[in-house]
Amino acid sequence: MRVEWSQGSPYRYAWEGGGLRFVGQDRPAPVNYGLVEGLLNPADGEEVDAVYLGPPLSPGEEAEGLLLGMVALADGDHKLLLAQSPEGLDPQEAARLLAWFSPERRPTLLGPEEAGAWVKSLKERQDRRLGAFLGLAVGDALGAQVEGLPKGTFPEVREMKGGGPHRLPPGFWTDDTSQALCLAESLLQRGVDPKDQMDRYLRWSREG
């Protein structure tokens, strides 16, 4: 977990691009709060949030711990519960943590089995997405050598040779993969935003 908000502090930060950005002040956090880098939550398209029990940790610090459970929220933006020891929360600590979230989000504490199953499902989902894009890029690069040629006018493609109308080196993908990546980034960062999608296509066309 990467700490963005220290336990007991009103100062909140966001971890972006390998560094901290100051967000502002809020009521003091009852726990250390941050994110799990590289693990995305489809509920908001952002990296999974986590809370870390124990003494305050510095913003930007990387902390590892045991998965004790999670705070499940109605909007799907669940928070993993981490700690160095397996003791977990006492009833008063649990009540303070749940009270930190608005009642409309219906915060509920779940155990390590439920939390582990959720994390596993997220990783499997990411693996499928990565596999889809990897398959797209490999197939695109493999077919670049015969792009635009009518079926039956070329021998069976069995190796990565490159060439084709764009004279690409072996292993290079075409505009198909490039524009698919533009679309994926737009959907992740902006949701369904046709203007943002078109802006990215135009920027790719001009700048590559």
Model-derived regions, located:
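Structured, active/binding-site neighborhoods that engage oxygen-rich ligands
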Residues: 122-208
